[in-house]
Amino acid sequence: MAIHYETKATNVGGRKGHVYTDDRALDIDIVPPAQADGKATNPEQLFAAGYASCFNGAFDLILKQNKVRDAHPEVTLTVRLEDDPDSESPQLSVSIDATIKNVISQEEAEKYLQMAHEFCPYSKATQGNINVDLNVNVVD
């Protein structure tokens, strides 16, 4: 299997600590969500940022492969840390809310969103592990 990309991140101190990537492009304090102060982030925000970016890249690619131009996709990804009825530890769930310009029908937009979900590496990694809700709105 060919590796397309590899990166490393190191954390010291867990959810009340610090995380940095090997190239230091990301070098930031980590705090639990309840202690958010606007100067640090938390694992859920990092996951949301990575997944939203990856998913929107996949969505844009699928649209272009299907000759949909000027759709200008935008993806907002919500990560929730919620009770797990089967465990004492919490679980994650995700909502993916995409918006595209009115260049295709709602039905086509939903089809391409599903195709992006099947293509996106983050979606593949979470498949069967967390609940993921998909939504797309076609706007003027």
Swiss-Prot record:
GO biological process: response to oxidative stress
Coiled coil: none
Transmembrane segments: none
InterPro entries the record matches: KH_dom-like_a/b, OHR, OsmC/Ohr_fam, OsmC/Ohrsf
Domain of life, per lineage: Bacteria
Family as reported in the entry's similarity comment: Belongs to the OsmC/Ohr family.
NCBIfam families tied to this protein: organ_hyd_perox (TIGR03561)
Protein name, entry field: Organic hydroperoxide resistance protein-like
Organism encoding this protein: Staphylococcus aureus (strain bovine RF122 / ET3-1)
